[in-house]
Curated annotation (Swiss-Prot):
Membrane topology according to the record: Multi-pass membrane protein
UniProt keyword Transport, yes or no: yes
UniProt GO MF annotations: lipid binding; proton-transporting ATP synthase activity, rotational mechanism
Keyword Cell inner membrane among UniProt keywords: yes
Top-rank lineage group of the source organism: Bacteria
Keywords linked to the UniProt accession: ATP synthesis, Cell inner membrane, Cell membrane, CF(0), Hydrogen ion transport, Ion transport, Lipid-binding, Membrane, Transmembrane, Transmembrane helix, Transport
HAMAP family to which the protein is assigned, alphabetical: ATP_synth_c_bact
Name of the featured protein: ATP synthase subunit c
Family to which this protein belongs: Belongs to the ATPase C chain family.
PROSITE patterns named in the record: ATPASE_C (PS00605)
Short name of any one Pfam family annotated for the protein: ATP-synt_C
Amino acid sequence: METLLSFSAIAVGIIVGLASLGTAIGFALLGGKFLEGAARQPEMAPMLQVKMFIIAGLLDAVPMIGIVIALLFTFANPFVGQLAG
């Protein structure tokens, strides 16, 4: 039982860490490409900025889903019920 809970805690840490790392890399690439595009064509900067914010909002949903899965494993672990039952 303790082994299962410790593996679940490790899994939660990996899920949260990789979700955060992936989002950080995505935001870095998105911001870099936005600045590159705005430097090439300054008249397109407002339109690119709107699209960047839309994509940033969608990109921010990825770690939120990861946090929900991590909270599920933390507080309502489905594997503990199978082990006890």
